[in-house]
Amino acid sequence: MSASRPNRVVLVLNSGSSSLKFQLVEPDSGMSRATGNIERIGEESSSVPDHDAALRRVFEILAEDDIDLQSCGLVAVGHRVVHGGKDFYEPTLLNDAVIGKLDELSPLAPLHNPPAVLCIRVARALLPDVPHIAVFDTAFFHQLPPAAATYAIDRELADVWKIRRYGFHGTSHEYVSQQAAEFLGKPIGDLNQIVLHLGNGASASAVAGGRPVETSMGLTPLEGLVMGTRSGDLDPGVIGYLWRTAKLGVDEIESMLNHRSGMLGLAGERDFRRLRAMIDDGDPAAELAYDVFIHRLRKYVGAYLAVLGHTDVVSFTAGIGEHDAAVRRDTLAGMAELGISLDERRNACPSGGARRISADDSPVTVLVIPTNEELAIARHCCSVLVAV
């Protein structure tokens, strides 16, 4: 009798400048075989000098769990790539030509794309016999309506330099909107949804009938909601003002807006659990930071209610969205006249998994939906394998 074939698995890699997250996932069952995160890559005190060493460490971790990539049913390596620009909006089989084009997109995402491209090169060298596939954060928002995607700036400049609203966290927004429809037992085409992805990076989207019609992030992941270290929406005049008066260079300003702004800039803390403790201790900076975060979030919810006209579902996801009941409560407070009423008991319940937290008589259903970007990436990879 022949041995049964192992279930197919995809190794999903999500590379940052100093970190490498990985998950070995079965796209058909949704089961995770292994997951982990290599941090502090390249730091002086780290034992992991570069991404080559980090990926080799991933293989060691898998081997320690008795997982052999050669015999476990590995069918693809999926790479999360933050920015696909105008040209990449489908899961894409990686080759030298594609990787070269991704390198050229680095100015659009200087903090995110270079480490992803580096990881792709290392992974292809270490696993040369397995298809490597890029899945883009921007893909879901590729077909935003022109009125939502277009910035009101000089059209020639915008066309030459490919300036538009690209949107990010698209894999999460797509997955959560699909899971919300499945939870409600309704066709996604019949639902108008608002998805709030709230983590250290945060974004909102409006999804009509399964297609995005608005999102908060723009040309880069810097626009939109207040985030852990990013400012979100900002008067562009601030950049010129700091350049002229504070004598800061563009790179310094960009670094400040990405790494020393948001909750960290306002309160000196980006972790919401520690921020909550600071608020409980009466820290005025922490209180203000929280108020600014909630105010911005409520503005976007209100705007998207108007954009959609009729809203069926609001879903919270990602670390803060899934686990911080106070954020959910304060975001939707006083919106009963807009059709949104929370059930306080349901909202405060710490149970995991997809769940309804709105009142039974709320015209708009409010859900908590755990995101699973790795599973979504793995399934996108399999769609490419079917097509080739």
From Swiss-Prot:
Keywords: ATP-binding, Cytoplasm, Kinase, Magnesium, Metal-binding, Nucleotide-binding, Transferase. Mg(2+) binds at N14, E373. ATP binds at K21, H197, L198, G199, N200, G201, D271, F272, R273, G319, I320, G321, E322, H323. It is found in: Cytoplasm. Its EC number is 2.7.2.1. The record marks H169, R230 as: Transition state stabilizer. Catalyzes the formation of acetyl phosphate from acetate and ATP. Can also catalyze the reverse reaction. This is Acetate kinase. It comes from Mycobacterium marinum (strain ATCC BAA-535 / M).
